[in-house]
Amino acid sequence: LDKIYGAVINIAPAVEARLWKGAAFTGQVILPVWNNMVGQMDYVRAGVLTLSQEFGLPGGAFGRVTVGNFTNNRMGADLNLRYATPDDRWMFGVEGGVTGSSTFYEGKWQVSAWKRVSGAAEVRFRERRFNMDFNLGVHRYIYGDYGVRVDCIRHFGRTTAGLYAMYTGGEANGGFH
């Protein structure tokens, strides 16, 4: 290692097109401006390239399936199912996905088999008086580790601020979002 930091400046325009009811295509290209890294950072490359379809389910539940090239060099498929109570105070959800790597090295797009399985079960409580959400989720991450995450989110008009804490792989972490 000859650098104590890595820096990357990219321009990454994206477009989202509604195709039909509930369907969307998202396309992004990443244009490198400057970096002190080696590898894919030197090349024009695909960013997010996804096709998603939202759908309703009996009893007021809803879902979304998404396939394509995601962030963090992942490509695969994701299924998300949610149910919110009629007053929207409670929301319950499950999510599952299968992915492989998607990288761009030496001018070639390289993908692996979709073998990494992830999933989550989540519950959200909305406190209306202070316009806050409290989320609790248990997760299985793509490398097989399990974890729990708690979020406290406050909405101020069009601005949102939150805190989170998580525990996975024997380590605790937290921060702001």
Please describe what each predicted stretch is.
Residues 1-2, 25-35, 58-70, 91-99, ...:
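Transmembrane beta-strand segments that form the barrel wall of outer-membrane beta-barrel proteins
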Residues 26, 36-39, 74-76, 101-105, ...:
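Outer-membrane beta-barrel proteins
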Residues 1-50, 112:
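Outer-membrane beta-barrel initiation region
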Residues 69-73, 115:
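Short, well-structured alpha-helical patches and their helix-loop capping segments
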Residues 9-20, 44-57, 76-96, 117-127, ...:
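Feature captures outer-membrane beta-barrel proteins of Gram-negative bacteria and organelles
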Residues 112-113, 141-145:
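Short amphipathic alpha-helix initiation/capping segments at coil-to-helix junctions
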